[in-house]
Amino acid sequence: MLVDILRIIFIVGGLTFVFMLVQACWQKRCNGTLESTPFWPVALIGGVANFLDTLGVGSFAVKTACYKQFKLIDDRVLPGTLNGQCVLPTVTQSLIFIGAVAVEPLTLISMMIAAAAGAAWGARHVASFDRQTIRLVMAISLLVVAGLIFAGLLGLFPVGGDAMGLGGYKLAIALLGNFIFGVLMNVGIGLFAPCMTLVYLLGMNPLAAFPIMMGSTAVLSVFSAGTFIRKGAFDAKAVLAVAIFGPIGVVLAAMLVKSMDMEMLKWLVAFIVIYTSWTMYASWRAARRSPVQLAVERAG
């Protein structure tokens, strides 16, 4: 019953987004402001990125790197474009994993609500955040966590478990963590890897992370993308391309995850955490070097 209700919520949210996107694309076309973004390169990048996203590797970092490398998307509309592109893929992810992985209802629903509340609070206070400090702290924290996970896999440290739900102080920690991750999504830090790490460290089955993190992101993305669409701060053609081809990558990856051995999945989690730590550090380093390079260029 609960699974059916959640699926209806996700479907309604997805259809609402589709209506808003089609309406916005039509208006831009009528006004002559529809972007000239190349459709197929963006669609291919979106399909691959969302394949990786379903495995737990956040798609934001992959897509941002590709868009900047090939100069496909204007930086001014990049945040809105990324948020819009993730709606239908995350809705697809949620529809697949909500029913396939039996997470304890209280844990699933409460963590989704916590993430949504964090995103709502963060949207009002995001301007006061120091993104550089957040990136560096997250990079170091995830690196430490990766070390703990590897130690557990090698039998040096007890970590992970088989639980499909949380209670007591562990649930409280999970709710606080997901609230914070929801806040951080407003500064471009994806929820997937931190949520997966938290769930694993609290003793849950790694597979339980998938419906939790995907359900949380699906709820958030519908609201955040709607805001960007209303403001017109997005690339309509790029969003449309990934809205079509992103879910295809999701379905292919979901088939792989479902058939994956649990021990292999634990190793995948560890490598995803290390990768995310590196991308956080790389973003911090790039943003730190930019003002210095600009000063050197001006002096030259």
List each model region and its residues:
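Juxtamembrane transmembrane-helix boundary motif
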Residues: M1-A49, I98-N186, Y200-L201, P206, ...
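Hydrophobic, membrane-facing alpha-helical anchors
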Residues: T33-L34, V57-C66, L88-T92, G161-A172, ...
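Short helix-coil transition sites and intra-membrane helix breaks within transmembrane domains
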Residues: N50-F60, G182-F192
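Juxtamembrane transmembrane-helix termini in multi-pass membrane transport proteins
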Residues: L52, G58-V103
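Interfacial segments of multi-pass membrane proteins
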Residues: K63-V77, A193-A208
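Paired intracellular helix-loop junctions of major facilitator superfamily
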Residues: L72-D75, F228-I229, M262
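Transmembrane helix-bundle signature of multi-pass membrane transporters/permeases
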Residues: P79-V87, F210-A218, A243-P247
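Membrane-helix boundary/interface segments in integral membrane proteins
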Residues: L198, V222-I229
